[in-house]
Regions:
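Polytopic transmembrane helical bundles with strong interfacial aromatic enrichment
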Residues: 1-170
Length: 170
């Protein structure tokens, strides 16, 4: 991400920006990154091979067995049920936050590049959410799982692109 930011610095000179908008976009980027990291735990534990129903996890909103390890914090990293539930929850919060944030920020900026990045971010977060559901329901079809991971990178890049476009002047 730092390499992309530096490349954008070279390609696009600094224009008057909206400092708060840039910070908000970087916060959204951080949330997307956290969600992607939680997805790494899902992939690493093969957690997508279980609870292949949506939106409920085998009939429960909060699955039985959530945070069962002792100490409970270990469940966040080692328990398939907890890891998958947390990723679902983070993905939902991230989707809502990116869409709401993009809508609000589009009202604040007239920069065409930032606006394009925000539109792309909204489309990508919806695509990402749907790909996550499809991956889960398919019991982790590799093509869908790979596309889901690649879309996360595209989403982070689109948010970074928008944040760079509205960064404050030095």
């Amino acid at each position: 991400l730092a390499l992309i930011w530096t490349a954008l610095d070279v390609l696009r000179p600094r224009a008057p920006g909206l400092g708060k908008a840039s910070r908000r976009l970087l916060l959204l980027l951080g949330l997307v990154f956290l969600t992607a990291m939680s997805g790494g735990f899902v992939a690493g534990l093969d957690a997508g091979m279980t609870y292949n129903t949506f939106p409920l996890m085998d009939g429960d909103l909060i699955p039985e067995g959530y945070l069962v390890y002792d100490p409970a914090w270990k469940s966040l990293f080692e328990d398939i049920t907890t890891v998958q539930f947390n990723h679902r929850l983070l993905a939902t919060l991230t989707g809502v936050a990116v869409i709401a944030g993009a809508v609000l920020l589009m009202r604040q900026t007239t920069d065409p590049i930032a606006r394009r990045g925000l539109i792309v971010s909204k489309l990508l977060v919806i695509t990402q959410y749907l790909l996550g559901i499809a991956t889960l329901l398919s019991v982790v079809a590799i093509s869908l799982a790979t596309l889901h991971q690649a879309t996360a990178l595209l989403l982070m890049t689109a948010l970074l692109f928008s944040a760079h476009a509205v960064r404050p002047s030095r």
